[in-house]
């Protein structure tokens, strides 16, 4: 390919990205996924923590069925408070953090949306790492057990 073609192709790609309004930082959910991977046992994947219990995954209702499900319940409420009280957008808020010595450090000024959301994710990820994963609580019948 000729250098001029590469230049035109690059310009088209840059303008398409700008038109699509794609944020320059990864979405918060990617950060949360990485935190979870860091704290859970090696034999588990972060995906096994979706559709677990009554609250791990989209939505949630009823009483959490175990300690791990309570982690998700608390996380959902933390995101809810971030939205209602602080006017943040937790699922898309980018933030800075560091994974070190089996813990997670959130950066940024206290009270900012970035720090609030990071603290929500940090608390949940550490809770996941400290909670037992019960295979029978994956993909439960939420209509039956989560009312």
Curated annotation (Swiss-Prot):
UniProt key word Zinc: no
Pfam families: Phospholip_A2_1
UniProt-listed InterPro entries: PLipase_A2, PLipase_A2_Asp_AS, PLipase_A2_dom, PLipase_A2_dom_sf, PLipase_A2_His_AS
CDD domains: PLA2c (cd00125)
Keywords: Calcium, Disulfide bond, Hydrolase, Lipid degradation, Lipid metabolism, Metal-binding, Neurotoxin, Presynaptic neurotoxin, Secreted, Signal, Toxin
GO cellular component entries: extracellular region
Active site: 75, 121
Disulfide bonds: 54-146, 56-72, 71-127, 78-120, 88-113, 106-118
Compartment(s) where it occurs, according to its Swiss-Prot or TrEMBL record: Secreted
Propeptide: 20-27
Tissue: Expressed by the venom gland.
Annotated EC: 3.1.1.4
PROSITE patterns listed in its UniProt record: PA2_ASP (PS00119), PA2_HIS (PS00118)
Function: Snake venom phospholipase A2 (PLA2) that inhibits neuromuscular transmission by blocking acetylcholine release from the nerve termini. PLA2 catalyzes the calcium-dependent hydrolysis of the 2-acyl groups in 3-sn-phosphoglycerides.
Protein name, per record: Basic phospholipase A2 beta-bungarotoxin A1 chain
Lineage of producing organism: Eukaryota, Metazoa, Chordata, Craniata, Vertebrata
């Amino acid at each position: 390919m000729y250098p001029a073609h590469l230049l035109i192709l690059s310009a088209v790609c840059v303008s398409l990205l700008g038109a699509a309004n794609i944020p320059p930082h990864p979405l918060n959910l990617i950060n949360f996924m990485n935190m979870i991977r860091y704290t859970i046992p090696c034999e588990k994947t972060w995906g096994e923590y979706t559709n677990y219990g009554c609250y791990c995954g989209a939505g949630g209702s009823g009483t959490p069925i175990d300690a791990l499900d309570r982690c998700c319940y608390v996380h959902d409420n933390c995101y809810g408070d971030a939205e209602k009280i602080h006017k943040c957008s937790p699922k898309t808020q980018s933030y800075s953090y560091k994974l070190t010595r089996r813990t997670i450090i959130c950066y940024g000024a206290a009270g900012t949306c970035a720090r609030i959301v990071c603290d929500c994710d940090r608390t949940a990820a550490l809770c996941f790492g400290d909670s037992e994963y019960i295979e029978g609580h994956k993909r439960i019948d939420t209509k039956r057990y989560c009312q």
